Amino acid sequence: MTTTTATRDSKGRFTGSKRTSTTHNLGVIAGAAAGGMALGMLALLGRKAVVQAPTALAGNWDEALATEHEAVRKVFDQIEATDEHSTTKRNLLLAHLKHALMKHAVEEENVIYPALREAGQKQAADELTKEHGYVKQYLYELENMPTASPDWIAKIRQFRGEIEEHMAEEEMRLFPMLRAQLSDEKNKALTLTMNKEGFKVA
């Protein structure tokens, strides 16, 4: 697109000059796009920081994971407080539960379970990893069932029972044993690495 603007020459006479505004417009659009992208990245990083903050602030890695376990129990409580008419709420809570569990699984599978293996607990780490596979299976089945169905809430309760056994085994036996085997320095390094992994998927 071109525009004509009136200008005066050195003798004060009006002259017409043509200016192409396409380049100018493209510059404005590119600048706006870059600004929008930068704001989007800041918002994403801010959201990730908010999601990971409760874990990062909880203390050592085992305390942080116990905090996440408690958050999962609270989501189960909220789900079980719904009825068959609360389908939208159930879907939202299930999505929240899935995200929390997937982030938690990444932290454990990428950081804590390898540390368990290094500490001589390969069989226990393999069993915990296998149980995470069942978690994913439960989530898949729940996402593909009508949330108004009585079978859906029954599946939630079955899922909760199994996942609480898994969490209890970690909190009561395996995690305290691992923490006791590691030096303070190694525990701090494990905590830092775990929080980095959690931040990636928060």
Positions of predicted regions on the chain:
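Small-residue-biased structural context
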Residues: T2-A202
